[in-house]
Amino acid sequence: MGDAPSPEEKLHLITRNLQEVLGEEKLKEILKERELKIYWGTATTGKPHVAYFVPMSKIADFLKAGCEVTILFADLHAYLDNMKAPWELLELRVSYYENVIKAMLESIGVPLEKLKFIKGTDYQLSKEYTLDVYRLSSVVTQHDSKKAGAEVVKQVEHPLLSGLLYPGLQALDEEYLKVDAQFGGIDQRKIFTFAEKYLPALGYSKRVHLMNPMVPGLTGSKMSSSEEESKIDLLDRKEDVKKKLKKAFCEPGNVENNGVLSFIKHVLFPLKSEFVILRDEKWGGNKTYTAYVDLEKDFAAEVVHPGDLKNSVEVALNKLLDPIREKFNTPALKKLASAAYPDPSKQKPMAKGPAKNSEPEEVIPSRLDIRVGKIITVEKHPDADSLYVEKIDVGEAEPRTVVSGLVQFVPKEELQDRLVVVLCNLKPQKMRGVESQGMLLCASIEGINRQVEPLDPPAGSAPGEHVFVKGYEKGQPDEELKPKKKVFEKLQADFKISEECIAQWKQTNFMTKLGSISCKSLKGGNIS
């Protein structure tokens, strides 16, 4: 057996890959004297998803550093947070969480015997704890409590009192679990600073707080247990993983708001220390990255294509999920999963009258606001060699700013004054500091010698003319496509260039009133 790690080595293990540490000097002092006592809590709400591998990998680090680690299944918190977990399902949810999190830890080689597991209601309903809740409520302002839970507790128009209690209970957990530190996501920061402010008011000591970064969901927003579209469930089938990754936002050259790339950075690299891009030999073969920054650089330069990135993530992710799927492929755990998360369609309605908005939204091409545009100016992005910044006339009072990754594929002079096809109702987002107000649609052939061509409107088209799929010309486009609903991504999965170089959705042509949308030469290509 090797020598025990030094205090400095323990500090490195405890803090690596974290986004922020509050109380680092106190942490150093504790490590000089004894082992650190730390807890990680999770509210037992929606099904845990693949981003939970981020805290799992840190728990592995804590154990390597000799820490005494407690995992709290915060069932009472799950109920207090706008009843994300109904009272009658709390026990079942705790059991589900315990089984799935233990399976995750085993999947990455963490020894369970070194961990302590505890349920919130095992001590949060005691006389002493309840009295401290009242004591805390006598010194905490409504403003501070609401502010503390703003990024964690579900925000609604008429918030319940229970949501205001949530941060105080999480603060008290630090005292009642007798720990030196609490570990959580950066979204917990306001609760952590709340605890640092108010625990001393009750005569309790201020704890150390360790925060990991949040992994963006597949839509680019925070990955959430309670939002199905944003995440991959730990028990998703392989075909579901493929489907969700295929629809994930992963624009060529765009490293911002890229859920797929962020998952590699925050989950796969910390667990495996390397990542392999899987490619056919004719496209250059496999390439192994041992540093995330190198992968990000190649993706930004469009050396790595989104299709190869997604396929490689799919393979790596399924290797992590296979042991978890196998564990849950038993009658007892299948029954537990069904009982803890009953099918909503089989539940009795809670209120009289028909449910509003019960019909699923149609995902049809008419929801896209696609227009003919004319490029007025085109310049290199000041901070990204692979990006252009274009001013495009789309028939509005002022031209729109659009950022596109075409530098390596289309000379600047070919874009100047060119008629193009622009998706106009995406949510604006910053790309390397410049806000893009649309997407210039292009055909592409993937591979090591990737080819890209902007789509061409029919000759004689004018800026602002409506582009539609034949048969869907009458519909009203969404004012703004909501990223969480992934309308564009779902439709894009069926975009294709025909053998006649016509842009199509499900083999039906994209058109204007003057004819079909086309590209110059990329038969059988994709559209993005």
From Swiss-Prot:
Entry keywords, A to Z: Acetylation, Aminoacyl-tRNA synthetase, ATP-binding, Charcot-Marie-Tooth disease, Cytoplasm, Disease variant, Ligase, Neurodegeneration, Neuropathy, Nucleotide-binding, Nucleus, Phosphoprotein, Protein biosynthesis, RNA-binding, tRNA-binding
CDD domains per the UniProt record, alphabetical: tRNA_bind_EMAP-II_like (cd02799), TyrRS_core (cd00805)
Effect after changing residue 274 to K: Found in a patient with hereditary motor and sensory neuropathy; uncertain significance
Binding site for trans-resveratrol: 39, 170, 173
Span(s) of short sequence motif 'KMSKS' region: 222-226
This enzyme's EC code(s): 6.1.1.1
Similarity comment text for this entry: Belongs to the class-I aminoacyl-tRNA synthetase family.
Designated name of the protein: Tyrosine--tRNA ligase, cytoplasmic
